Amino acid sequence: MLKSLRFVWWLTKAFILRHGKTIVWTIVISVFMALAGLKILPKLLAAIKPSRAFSTIAMVGKVRSNELPITILFKLSQGLTQIDESGRAIPGLAKSWTVSENGKSYVFDLDKSKIWHDGTPVTAKDINIAIEHVQTEVVDNQTIKFTLEQPYAPFPTVLSKPLFKNRLVGTGNFRLKKLVQNGEFTDSITIEDGSRTEIYKFYLSSADTITALKLGEVDEIADLISINDVPKWNQFEIKPERHLDRYLAVLFNTQDKFLAEKSVRQALAYDIPNKPQDENRVISPISKSSWAYNPLVKPYNWDISQAKELLKGVEEINSVKLEISTFLPYLSRAEEIAAAWTDLGIPTSVKVTLVLPSEFQVLITGQQIPADPDQYVFWHSTQSTNLTKYANPKVDKLLEDGRETLNEDKRQEIYRDFQRFLLEDPPAVFLGHITTYSVFRK
C-alpha cells in the first residue's frame, strides 16, 4: 500500500515539474473567464432575447387630439360593433344586440370579458356616444339602449367607431404611451403593444414627410397618394396598397346647363380612356365586397363611337367649354380625360385646387366607401353633401326606403335598384380603387 502511494506521489510530482507552467496558466485563465462570465453572461442573454420592434412613421395632416387618424384609433380600441368584409356589423365591445319591430330602439349587451387598458372592466356607464336625434340610456352595467326618432337600418355599423374611457384609454392590442401636442394640434403619438412601439409624426405636406425620411427623422411614410416626389434611392422601398374602401370618381355638376343633359353625361362617361380592366375597376358607389353590390349596372366601358352617337343633336356642343377641377395627386388622370374630351369636340381644361370647391363643372376626387350600402348623404336631393346636386325622384325614394327597411333581403333589392337607376342617369363616373403608398427605409 505504501509503495503504491509513493508511486502516485512520484508520478504526480514528475507531471507537475514537467507541466507546471501550463497548469498555472490554465487555472489563472479559468478563474478570469469565470469572473468575466458573471458580468458578460447577463448581457449575452439580453442580446439573445427578442428585441422590441420600433418604428417612426410619418403621416400627412394637421391633426387634433380628438381627430386622430382612424387607422390609429382602431389599433387603440374598438366600437360596440365591428365591420366584417361584407360590410355587416358584427360583435365588438357588445356581444349581441336586438332591435325593436319599429326599428327605432336598439339594445346592446356588453361583452363581460372586455377590459380597458387601465385594468377595469367595460361597463355601460363608460360608453359615451352622442349622436344627433338619438337618446342613450344605461339600463344596467352590461346593457345600453339607443332610441332613434326614425328607423335607421345602418345604425349598428355607425357604432363601429372606436370608443375610449377618459383620454384614449381603449381596449385594443395597442395602448397609448405618449401624446405630444402643440396647442390644439398633435405633433406625435406613441403607441405600443407587447412587442412593438410605433411613433406617428404628423407633417403639413407630403414634401415634408419625404424630407423627414431623407434626414432620418422617420423610418416610414404611410398613406402617400403620389410617389412622384419620392427619390429613387436604393435605401428606400416603396409598397403600394389598394384600398377597396376608396374610389376615384368623376363628378358632374348636374345643375350645369350643358351637363344637366343625361345624354351628355353618358357620352362623357363613355369617353374616359384607360379605365382599369382588373380588380381595380369600380363601376358603382357600393363596394364590390358588399352584400348589396349590383354587378349588372351599366359599366361605361370606353367607346368613342357610342359617345359621339349620344352627342348628336346636342345644340351646345359647338360652343361649350368644360373645366375639370381636381387635386394635385390626380392631375395626370384629369389631363388624360381632358385630352380625350377635347378630341371628342368638347374643349376641356384642368384646374388644380387645394380645397374642395363649392362650385365646379366637373370634379375628379377620391371618396371613402361607407361600410353600409346606405348612400343617402351622397345622392339624395336634400343633402348639402350631394356634391353633384343630383336630383332624381326615383333614386330619392330608393335611398329613403333603403335606410328605413330592416330586412336585409329587401334592402339588397332596394340598393341593387338604386345602383341601376343611378348609373342609367349618371351624376358620376366611378373609375377605380385608390392606391396609396408606404415608403420604407431599408
In which residue ranges do the predicted regions lie?
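N-terminal lobe/hinge region of extracytoplasmic solute-binding protein
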Residues: S55-E101
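Gly/Pro-rich hinge or "lid" segments in bacterial periplasmic/extracellular proteins
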Residues: N141, T147-Y200, L204-D208
